[in-house]
Amino acid sequence: IMDGTAIVISPLIALMKNQVDAMRNFSEEDGVAHFINSSLNKSAIDQVKSDILSGKTKLLYVAPESLTKEENVDFLKGVKISFYAVDEAHCISEWGHDFRPEYRRIRPIINEIGKAPVIALTATATPKVRMDIQKNLGMQDAQEFKSSFNRPNLYYEVRSKTNNIDRDIIKFIKANPGKSGIIYCLSRKKVEELAEVLQANGINARAYHAGMDSATRTANQDGFLKEDIDVIVATIAFGMGIDKPDVRFVIHYDIPKSLEGYYQETGRAGRDGGEGQCITFYSNKDLQKLEKFMQGKPVAEQEIGKQLLLETAAYAESSICRRKS
């Protein structure tokens, strides 16, 4: 193990908790991995800092917003940093499916804290996004490792979205009893409505979105990971980095905003190598709704959003094999 503490920059609280829990399973010392984010109170943050200074902590997970706080920058300047890992690195690119402006501040902060090797990781990056990541992180001479997007164990299907969509989903889930699955909806309102409909039809389902209180959100996530809950109905706030190997189906209630986002979300199925079914419900109305959402955003952002959306629509409307398209 390298000397010092590695800083892992991660975008979501749920993702940090999941990964810290996993790391602690490999060690008798809970202090080996910690996270700093807005969910911690002052005494918890003081404990984290104490473990780092004592040399116990090998991995520190932080959100970009926490990393840029002056008090955290000042503290980390006095810590030996072994390396920086930028997780979900596609968030740095305007061409990525989940652009987050705060990711653009990572390189200047690294320079301020103290230079160390940098690794950037993502499961979904087009050539344009990869170039953007390297440019923004100052990694022009980086060594690049790529693997195929193709997951032969996943079955992709696009269905027409009709007024009977809820009934179609209930029928599908009941034909696959006890199997773990995720259903993605674009709006929080629809997430809660659909979770209630599924529960009323005897399906062990729960909702998950960023607007819920953190205790309920965490309980629902943990219940899903521990097999107490079969189906999670969620916005895209759920799932990034959640490593549950036996998810058997991923359903998109609405068309995704980009193909990269779609790949990332469907990629949560079949991680154990077993079969995974990926079903998307598509209607032209959804397309119009998403285009409407983009109005009022900066022109450059609108143009990128429209291009990504057109690629997704072309995939949904294609008559050839989904894997080829």
What do these predicted regions represent?
Residues 304-325:
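Cys/His-rich short segments
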Residues 1-4, 10, 17-300, 304-307:
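Helicase motor core with emphasis on the C-terminal RecA-like subdomain
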